Amino acid sequence: MEDLDALLSDLETTTSHMPRSGAPKERPAEPLTPPPSYGHQPQTGSGESSGASGDKDHLYSTVCKPRSPKPAAPAAPPFSSSSGVLGTGLCELDRLLQELNATQFNITDEIMSQFPSSKVASGEQKEDQSEDKKRPSLPSSPSPGLPKASATSATLELDRLMASLSDFRVQNHLPASGPTQPPVVSSTNEGSPSPPEPTGKGSLDTMLGLLQSDLSRRGVPTQAKGLCGSCNKPIAGQVVTALGRAWHPEHFVCGGCSTALGGSSFFEKDGAPFCPECYFERFSPRCGFCNQPIRHKMVTALGTHWHPEHFCCVSCGEPFGDEGFHEREGRPYCRRDFLQLFAPRCQGCQGPILDNYISALSALWHPDCFVCRECFAPFSGGSFFEHEGRPLCENHFHARRGSLCATCGLPVTGRCVSALGRRFHPDHFTCTFCLRPLTKGSFQERAGKPYCQPCFLKLFG
């Protein structure tokens, strides 16, 4: 602050010698943008009195003079000749100095903490020497032809001055010999030691803590929701709950093809999830017809599994109805085709026997087909006669064998008379004219008819 007081006194002296005609017309002061706010931290040491006139391009560098004893100032003209210019400049300078006094400490300490102390000290010494060389060459008063900067320009120059102050600090009291000591920065609580710098682990924990607190403020849950069933690590954020466990969404995948199963259906086998394709391909039963996995409805028959549309007759390809199916050598058949292909045949019609049948003459017969093969009359009493492997009634059987009575046409079952190439009942072998029995065994034959001897002589003499 001592340098600033000297700066103010030099400015008053210089502005008092400015001619009134050379002073430019003052512009009205513009509202200043308030500087950024910083927390005030008092400092000790000589670094506060930095060389405010170190920048050769600074607006107020013209008032800086060497530190040699100042000669006696000449008699100043009456104050009334430059009272307008001086009053406006002093008011503007007072406002700038107030802003500088409020912000220079915190800005300097904050920026200087980013540079090593050795480099800062050496830079300060070099800058101090360069400033001492430059100060005598500067003019003692500003050029009368240059216009006076406005309040906004002064604020910008003040910001530039503050930026230069943040680059170096001049130490007024340095030891005569020995290494350069860094400036001592004091905090508000001077009795407490400065906190140690956080280690890498502490910084990481701090960052994680800040991240979790920020996520919590945004409504994102950060608490662990259990351990992942795949990687066994804590879960934070999105979670998939399935099979009685919690999973990371990227770890809940198919056990076969590793496809993510977060929003799709899946199947479980031995505690592991599988997508439908892998599950059916690996664990579904195979169809006995097409050998493909069965996904939905299934028919179990003949010791294997079938698609419903594939369990059909192997002969006609028709699906089985309510009547069921028949099996032959492990292959299913419908009733019609099975009976047509494998059912026993009727000896009479050669058709398949579906229901009742009669077994006779070493063959199977439909009940309606087992009749006399000559007259097709059913057998009364269940008895029949067989001739050359064919069933016959009694009359047709004796007719085939020639054992019918030539007179009455009935079968001859007992005693018989064989004559004229035919058989007769004994009572039915008589004379054709007188009808007497021909018991004596002698008869005459005429046109295939038997006659007794008297009738034959009488008729045919």
Curated annotation (Swiss-Prot):
Residues 226-285, 286-343, 344-403, 404-461 form the LIM zinc-binding domain. Residues 40-52, 183-192 have a biased composition (Polar residues). Changing residue 372 to S: Loss of AR coactivation. Phosphorylated by gonadotropin-releasing hormone-activated SRC. A motif (LD motif 2) lies at residues 92-104. GO terms for cellular component: cytoskeleton; cytosol; focal adhesion; intracellular membrane-bounded organelle; nuclear matrix. The modification Phosphoserine is found at residues 68, 137, 140-141, 143, 164, 186, 192, 194, 403. Residues 83-136 are annotated as: Interaction with PTK2/FAK1. A motif (LD motif 1) lies at residues 3-15. Residues 1-200 are annotated as: Transcription activation. The modification N-acetylmethionine is found at residue 1. InterPro entries: Paxillin_TGFB1I1_LIM_dom1, Tgfb1i1/Leupaxin/TGFB1I1, Znf_LIM. Functions as a molecular adapter coordinating multiple protein-protein interactions at the focal adhesion complex and in the nucleus. Links various intracellular signaling modules to plasma membrane receptors and regulates the Wnt and TGFB signaling pathways. May also regulate SLC6A3 and SLC6A4 targeting to the plasma membrane hence regulating their activity. In the nucleus, functions as a nuclear receptor coactivator regulating glucocorticoid, androgen, mineralocorticoid and progesterone receptor transcriptional activity. Homooligomer. Interacts with PPARG. Interacts with TRAF4. Interacts with CRIP2. Interacts with HSPB1. Interacts with ILK. Interacts with LIMS1 and LIMS2. Interacts with NCK2. Interacts with NUDT16L1. Interacts with PAK. Interacts with PTPN12. Interacts with TCF3. Interacts with TCF7L2. Interacts with VCL. Interacts (via LD motif 3) with GIT1. Also interacts with GIT2. Forms a complex with ARHGEF7. Interacts with AR/androgen receptor in a ligand-dependent manner. Interacts with CSK. Interacts with PTK2/FAK1 and PTK2B/PYK2. Interacts with SLC6A3 and SLC6A4. Interacts with NR3C1. This is Transforming growth factor beta-1-induced transcript 1 protein. It comes from Homo sapiens. The gene is TGFB1I1.
